[in-house]
């Protein structure tokens, strides 16, 4: 049981969990513990850190902004960091995404997108309210986000309170998968059937990679077929890029790598480089225009106390600048992982290896499987003993490190993982 008398930790079994490791500092890809040990942050501290901890350029941007304007209400007021961030983002986003709405985290970015999609149809006086999502999806822990996520132990206590969503098969794939085309065909057939009635408001998907659902990967071809069907049905496509955005898939955004154009996109995690909580939902001008009629009923009545926080915006601007400077590194992420993952894939305890950009994953052979598989905790503990921060999703082992990690360091991590798999 965690020893602190007042803290309550997320996603942690209160009775069974070992004491948390106390971190005193971070620099680059490394974290320093209170006892002096160092860990390589192989998962970007829950997928948020892009450039490494304590990156001076982001530190200075936050400090300068804090000395100028730390926060101001964003209703009826604006400020330069928000305006500049919106302009810079729209230069790199899929071209039709032009209207930026700020909130606080990935869950709220999804909530905003769902509300925008549903109110879009309300504003048009068209009775569309059906939402389609995918098996294995995870979109966050607030009620709307839970509703569009797979029913699981994460949301089981609240299931009766979640709104109705239709879930479609997700054609996950991996290296050597000979059934992927059949799975995609079945998934598209299910999409077509669900869209046939013409009353679907929106379809939401994590493009290319489902994160917390197990780093389940899909091919661009499937996304392209999906987007075409959704567009033909007149429905809206919501891309949840909370995890995949800002280079994680080897492109600025997974939508761009997949060659699709969403109507709404949800961004967070890497938005500020991992320094501060901030999220953004970006909509097309077509959606935005339905909120501009002058009818008070068409106003988007949604906001947060820290909407468009200037410190977060300043951090995000600095992070975008760093991404522009390291674009070649982002484009080379997949090549950097490839040798190590190919070697790891030969291990007898590894199955279903898969790779998209800088997101590498595999399943560990286990009798149980699933999020509560105890093999995950054994891997975590063995990794810490080797100076690595890993947090498997049950029997799903993955790497999602910050971009500052060198290819040599990455190969050393793969070798250490192979070594620990020999022992657990």
Curated annotation (Swiss-Prot):
It is found in: Cytoplasm. Pathway: Cofactor biosynthesis; biotin biosynthesis; 7,8-diaminononanoate from 8-amino-7-oxononanoate (SAM route): step 1/1. Keywords: Aminotransferase, Biotin biosynthesis, Cytoplasm, Pyridoxal phosphate, S-adenosyl-L-methionine, Transferase. The modification N6-(pyridoxal phosphate)lysine is found at residue 269. It is an enzyme of class 2 (transferase). GO terms for biological process: biotin biosynthetic process. Its cofactor is pyridoxal 5'-phosphate. Pyridoxal 5'-phosphate binds at residues 106-107, 240, 304-305. InterPro entries: Aminotrans_3, Aminotrans_3_PPA_site, BioA, PyrdxlP-dep_Trfase, PyrdxlP-dep_Trfase_major, PyrdxlP-dep_Trfase_small. CDD domains: OAT_like (cd00610). Its EC number is 2.6.1.62. Substrate binds at residues 46, 138, 269, 303, 391. GO terms for cellular component: cytoplasm. The record marks 11 as: Participates in the substrate recognition with KAPA and in a stacking interaction with the adenine ring of SAM. Catalyzes the transfer of the alpha-amino group from S-adenosyl-L-methionine (SAM) to 7-keto-8-aminopelargonic acid (KAPA) to form 7,8-diaminopelargonic acid (DAPA). It is the only aminotransferase known to utilize SAM as an amino donor. Complements a bioU deletion in Synechocystis PCC 6803. Belongs to the class-III pyridoxal-phosphate-dependent aminotransferase family. BioA subfamily. Homodimer. This is Adenosylmethionine-8-amino-7-oxononanoate aminotransferase. It comes from Synechococcus elongatus (strain ATCC 33912 / PCC 7942 / FACHB-805) (Anacystis nidulans R2). The lineage of its organism: Bacteria, Bacillati, Cyanobacteriota, Cyanophyceae, Synechococcales.
């Amino acid at each position: 049981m965690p020893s602190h008398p007042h803290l309550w930790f997320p996603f942690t079994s209160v009775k069974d969990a070992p004491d948390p490791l106390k971190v005193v500092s971070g620099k680059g890809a490394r974290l320093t513990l209170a006892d002096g040990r160092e860990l390589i942050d192989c998962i970007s501290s829950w997928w948020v850190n892009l450039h490494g901890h304590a990156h001076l350029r982001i530190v200075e941007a936050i400090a300068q902004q804090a000395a100028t304007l730390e926060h101001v209400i964003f209703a009826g007021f604006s400020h330069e960091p928000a305006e500049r961030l919106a302009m810079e983002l729209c230069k790199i986003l899929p071209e039709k995404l032009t209207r930026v709405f700020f909130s606080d985290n990935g869950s709220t970015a999804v909530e905003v997108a769902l509300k925008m999609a549903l109110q879009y149809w309300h504003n048009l006086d068209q009775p569309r309210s059906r939402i389609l999502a995918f098996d294995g999806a995870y979109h966050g822990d607030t009620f709307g986000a839970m509703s569009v996520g797979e029913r699981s132990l994460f949301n089981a206590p609240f299931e009766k309170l979640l709104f109705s969503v239709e879930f479609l098969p997700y054609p996950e794939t991996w290296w050597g998968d000979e059934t992927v085309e059949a799975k995609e065909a079945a998934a598209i057939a299910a999409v077509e059937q669900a869209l046939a009635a013409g009353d679907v408001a929106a379809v939401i998907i994590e493009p290319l990679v489902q994160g917390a659902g197990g780093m389940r990967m899909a091919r661009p071809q499937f996304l392209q077929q999906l987007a075409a069907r959704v567009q033909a049905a007149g429905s809206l496509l919501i891309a949840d890029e909370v995890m995949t955005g800002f280079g994680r898939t080897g492109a600025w955004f997974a939508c761009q790598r997949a060659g699709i154009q969403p109507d709404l996109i949800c961004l967070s995690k890497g938005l500020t480089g991992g320094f501060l909580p901030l999220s953004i939902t970006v909509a097309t001008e077509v959606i935005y225009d339905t909120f501009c009629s002058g009818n008070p009923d068409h106003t988007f009545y949604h906001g947060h106390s820290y909407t468009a926080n200037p410190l977060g915006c300043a951090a995000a601007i600095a992070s975008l600048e760093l991404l522009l400077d390291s674009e070649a590194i982002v484009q080379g992420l997949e090549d950097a992982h490839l040798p190590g993952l190919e070697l790891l894939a030969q291990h007898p305890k590894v199955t279903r290896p898969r790779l998209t950009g800088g997101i590498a994953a595999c399943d560990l052979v286990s009798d149980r499987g699933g999020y509560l598989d105890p093999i995950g905790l054994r891997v975590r503990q063995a990794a810490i003993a080797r100076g690595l921060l890993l947090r498997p999703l049950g029997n799903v082992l993955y790497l999602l490190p910050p971009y500052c990690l060198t290819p040599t360091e990455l190969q050393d991590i793969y070798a250490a993982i192979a070594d620990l798999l020999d022992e657990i």
